[in-house]
Amino acid sequence: MILIIYAHPYPHHSHANKQMLEQAGTLENVEIRSLYHLYPDFNIDVAAEQEALSRASLIVWQHPMQWYSVPPLLKLWMDKVLTHGWAYGHGGTALHGKHLLWAVTTGGGENHFAIGSHPGFAVLSQPLQATALYCGLKWLPPFAMHCTFICDDDTLQAQARQYKQRLLAWQEVNHG
């Protein structure tokens, strides 16, 4: 099962993420957990989140990039849900062997993340990759949708279909 942990503080303002979720939602065996919908008060149900993670073979962290990082509720989710003795540390093997895909949208162009005046995209992914590896997850190459503020609907739809194809390809290789 693919579990999408979706974290967007303003989901109604994001055409890109909405289209990505719509495309992913057409696939079989996909569960979408919208953190800002489930936890508007930031009071995370750790047991429910761990149970959902236990059922997944592929975990997707989908969110807009905010200040070169994750939205605050996703960071809190990581702090609360990925606990010692469950996700890492002595006895913490619940996530071992599962795959993790980082699916991120950005307002800036891909060249904005080239090494130079701004950090490279690979550098920005390092904290998430380190978290994944520390929890025994298998890090997959990220899926990034850039320029989402200025893309027309056709471009956003095409990129959202690429996202769906990426998930479908993973399903075909890992479950069939």
UniProtKB/Swiss-Prot annotation:
Protein residues bound to FMN: 8, 14-17, 65-68, 105-108
Reaction(s) this enzyme catalyzes, per UniProt: a quinone + NADH + H(+) = a quinol + NAD(+); a quinone + NADPH + H(+) = a quinol + NADP(+)
One function term, GO molecular function aspect: NADH:ubiquinone reductase (non-electrogenic) activity
GO biological process entries: positive regulation of potassium ion transmembrane transport; potassium ion transport
GO CC, one annotated term: plasma membrane
Subcellular location: Cell inner membrane
Cofactor(s), by name: FMN
Membrane topology: Peripheral membrane protein
Disulfide bonds: none
Domain of life: Bacteria
Family listed: Belongs to the NAD(P)H dehydrogenase (quinone) family. KefF subfamily.
Functional summary from the UniProt entry: Regulatory subunit of a potassium efflux system that confers protection against electrophiles. Required for full activity of KefC. Shows redox enzymatic activity, but this enzymatic activity is not required for activation of KefC.
Name the UniProt record assigns to this protein: Glutathione-regulated potassium-efflux system ancillary protein KefF
UniProt source species: Salmonella typhi
Gene (name only): kefF
